[in-house]
Amino acid sequence: MQIAVCDDEKVYLDCLSRKIKACFKEFEIEISLDKYLNAVSFLEQHNQNPYDIVFLDILMPEMNGLDVANRIRNLSEKTIIIFITTENHLVYESFDYR
């Protein structure tokens, strides 16, 4: 299973990546996890080889996570998108992306 985590805050990126790895390990599921500090580098890779699951920060410079989700959906309906945010008001906007 190919997983990507995209967050512009390195501390959150590393912490979430560790937790994701631990959860999948607990259920004995092998994963490959890539980390990205910006949406542009993530999209370059995702466009070449789409991920199965993407953990995506909503608030990022250059391109926000909601715009990235639109680009993911244009490429693949199968990719599971899980939004990450500390802003409660953005949670409801993320419901429009399936």
Q: How would you describe each model-predicted region?
A:
Residues 5, 31, 43, 57:
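Generic anion/oxyanion-binding catalytic loop in active/binding sites
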Residues 10-34:
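Two-component/phosphorelay signaling modules centered on CheY-like receiver
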Residues 7-9, 86:
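Acidic di-acidic motifs
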Residues 6-7, 36, 54:
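Conserved sequence signature across two-component system core domains
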